[in-house]
Amino acid sequence: MKNSESLKEFKKLNSAQITEKIDQLRKDLFDLRFKQATRQLNETHKFKTIKKQVAQLLTLSKSQSASQTTSE
């Protein structure tokens, strides 16, 4: 999945789905760290992609909450 495609998909999510996706990605990141500590991880590039996705989702979440507060 390309970055632009994932960002487009993230923009379609509502705030509850974004929060759920962030929690899932953070669990995945924890699992990757655990695998790295036990030397079972071969795909170290996944750290970067998951961290980037979490950052994108957090940015979307903040912008959605900011737009809701300004519209009220």
UniProtKB/Swiss-Prot annotation:
GO terms for cellular component: cytosolic large ribosomal subunit. One of its GO terms (biological process) is translation. Keywords: Ribonucleoprotein, Ribosomal protein. InterPro entries: Ribosomal_protein_uL29 (IPR050063), Ribosomal_uL29 (IPR001854), Ribosomal_uL29_sf (IPR036049). The keyword Ribonucleoprotein applies. One of its GO terms (molecular function) is structural constituent of ribosome. Belongs to the universal ribosomal protein uL29 family. This is Large ribosomal subunit protein uL29. It comes from Prochlorococcus marinus (strain MIT 9312). The lineage of its organism: Bacteria, Bacillati, Cyanobacteriota, Cyanophyceae, Synechococcales.
